Amino acid sequence: MDLLLLLKAAIMGIVEGITEFLPISSTGHLILASELMNFWTKEKSAVFVVAIQMGAIAAVIYEYWSRLWGAATGMVTGEEKGRHLAISLILASIPIVLVGLSFGQTVKDLLFNDVAVAIGLIVGGVIIMWIEKNPPKVNAVEVENIGLKQAIWIGLIQVLSLIPGTSRSGATIIGAMFLGVSRKAATEFSFFLGIPVIIGAGLLDLYQSHEVLQTSFDWSVLGVGILVSFVSALLLIRALVAYVAKRDFMVFAWYRIVSGLLILLFAYTGWTIW
């Protein structure tokens, strides 16, 4: 058993769990962490990243099980709040499904590199700053108050997250705030919206990578990454909800900009850790 590889897997799990739901681009950080640590082969690393995202999204399902179950059953029972939330999530998921299936692989082939991630981080940071300095009037305080038109627009904005470094969470949270959704509701809606998007994209990626899974694959490495991702994501979700109740996202804007500049530096110097 390669203990160093297990350690790297745990670090990747922590990176995924912490960054998946923050507006700072989990994909960008995972690409950077993988390259800095020379983590696994390119093919195995890609499968690993998809798998640990499942661990992070499982944390959302665990934390919000009662509300999500209410949304699922609301489609059958007709309970108003649950049904409205379910329809909102479905509508918001459609754009990225259509665009992702049509152009997702093309985007990966062209833009999955350090420079693209850095640019996405910097541009996103500037947009977050602008939104926080010019906050729109809030018209949806809770997730259940988000209108169907707002949900559709959030879904359209989420398509931008196909670009590495943009951040799915960043696009949906800031997009929702721009449309008048409260910071807390925008954050929780982003959590929920990640469930169909990440699971759907993940299953598709795993299916397309079945040849890699059939080779000599170290499943213990995968297990460590998923478990660590789940635990770290669960802790992050609880901390973030408490954070946004009192503070804004300006610190993340600065983080994105500084991180983007550092990634550009690493990209042009070829610096690695191990």
From Swiss-Prot:
> MF terms per GO, please?
undecaprenyl-diphosphatase activity
Answer whether the UniProt record assigns the keyword Cell inner membrane to this protein. Answer: yes
Under which EC number(s) is this enzyme classified?
3.6.1.27
- Catalytic activity from the UniProt record: di-trans,octa-cis-undecaprenyl diphosphate + H2O = di-trans,octa-cis-undecaprenyl phosphate + phosphate + H(+)
The reply to whether Lipoprotein figures as a keyword in the UniProt entry is: no
Record's subcellular location: Cell inner membrane
Membrane-topology annotation of the record: Multi-pass membrane protein
Q: Where are the transmembrane segments?
A: 4-24, 45-65, 84-104, 111-131, 146-166, 186-206, 217-237, 249-269
Q: What's one GO BP annotation on this UniProt entry?
A: peptidoglycan biosynthetic process
Q: Which InterPro entries match?
A: UppP (IPR003824)
- Give the record's keywords alphabetically: Antibiotic resistance, Cell inner membrane, Cell membrane, Cell shape, Cell wall biogenesis/degradation, Hydrolase, Membrane, Peptidoglycan synthesis, Transmembrane, Transmembrane helix
Pfam families named among the record's database cross-references: BacA
Give the UniProt entry's GO cellular component terms. Answer: plasma membrane
Q: Which family does it belong to?
A: Belongs to the UppP family.
Q: Explain the purpose of this protein.
A: Catalyzes the dephosphorylation of undecaprenyl diphosphate (UPP). Confers resistance to bacitracin.
Q: Cite any additional comment in the entry.
A: Bacitracin is thought to be involved in the inhibition of peptidoglycan synthesis by sequestering undecaprenyl diphosphate, thereby reducing the pool of lipid carrier available.
Which PANTHER family does the UniProt record give? UNDECAPRENYL-DIPHOSPHATASE
The name this protein carries in UniProt is Undecaprenyl-diphosphatase 1
| Native source organism of the sequence | Acinetobacter baylyi (strain ATCC 33305 / BD413 / ADP1)
